[in-house]
């Protein structure tokens, strides 16, 4: 294993540019799992980002919450302003593993790990989060709902780092985060759901029911139009257009689809037309 330890962001970007197969390392919580499952992953070159102090804090502007590239789940949990304005971020952070994972794991790492069952990504997407990428060539911003192109595939080049995540500040009239797993804590989601309503409209984001975490535009349109929904089964045709669950070791496609329908029906029962 070869570990490179830059002191500044420019140094880190230079190292990524020079080492095309280098893997950025932040909290390391997901990488440790990969090392256990795939011992050959140790052979990579890693760029340890732990000295990049500028990427650690979260901050606020008049228009947005800014999560740094190294902001941890615990940073969000303990921030009172975030608890008030973006409670789903706190809800999701509290469900990411144990306290040790929450203390080390980063929001940017959760995005780049690209797990379809991630806890942090659905709520960021429901809040219209924007990924800020930087390389030696410059910066670009990518809406999180356009960041993934397929399973473990994303709009990030090997020489780019996520240096920030922008979360627009809006007035929300409704927001909920649901996670269904084998246990009440420290479980990987069988089904995840984040829903928000603001002046920008409805956002319905599903996890663990497709190759990527994704918005559900068909379900969103039902909410926007006040469609009549008398039971969870009425939602199944719309869900079928938005997601593509699979059978795996944690659950079945049939179970996931029907749990998602029940969550949507019961959580949003005040908004469905009669």
Short names for language-model regions:
Residues 1-274:
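C-terminal structural segment of proteins
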């Amino acid at each position: 294993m070869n570990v490179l330890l830059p002191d500044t962001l420019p140094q880190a970007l230079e190292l990524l540019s020079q080492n095309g197969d280098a893997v950025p390392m932040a909290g390391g919580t997901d990488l440790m799992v990969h090392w256990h499952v795939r011992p050959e992953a140790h052979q990579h070159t890693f760029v340890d980002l732990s000295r990049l102090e500028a990427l650690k804090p979260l901050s606020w502007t008049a228009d947005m919450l800014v999560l740094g590239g190294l902001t941890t789940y615990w940073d969000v949990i303990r921030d009172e302003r975030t608890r008030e304005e973006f409670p789903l971020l706190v809800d999701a952070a509290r469900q990411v593993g144990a306290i040790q994972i929450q203390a080390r794991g980063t929001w940017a790492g959760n995005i780049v790990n690209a797990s379809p069952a991630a806890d942090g990504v659905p709520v960021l997407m429901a809040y219209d989060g924007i990924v800020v990428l930087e390389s030696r060539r410059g910066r670009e911003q990518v809406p999180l709902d356009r960041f993934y192109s397929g399973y473990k595939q994303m709009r990030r080049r090997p020489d780019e780092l996520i240096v920030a995540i922008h979360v627009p500040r809006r007035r929300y009239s409704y927001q909920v985060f649901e996670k269904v797993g084998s246990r009440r804590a420290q479980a990987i989601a069988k089904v995840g759901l984040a829903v928000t309503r603001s002046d920008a409209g409805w956002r319905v984001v599903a996890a663990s029911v497709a190759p990527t975490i994704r918005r559900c535009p068909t379900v969103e349109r039902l909410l926007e139009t006040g469609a009549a929904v008398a039971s969870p089964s009425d939602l199944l045709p719309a869900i079928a257009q938005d997601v593509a669950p699979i059978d795996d070791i944690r659950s079945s496609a049939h179970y996931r689809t029907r749990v998602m329908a029940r969550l949507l029906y019961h959580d949003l029962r005040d908004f469905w037309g009669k």
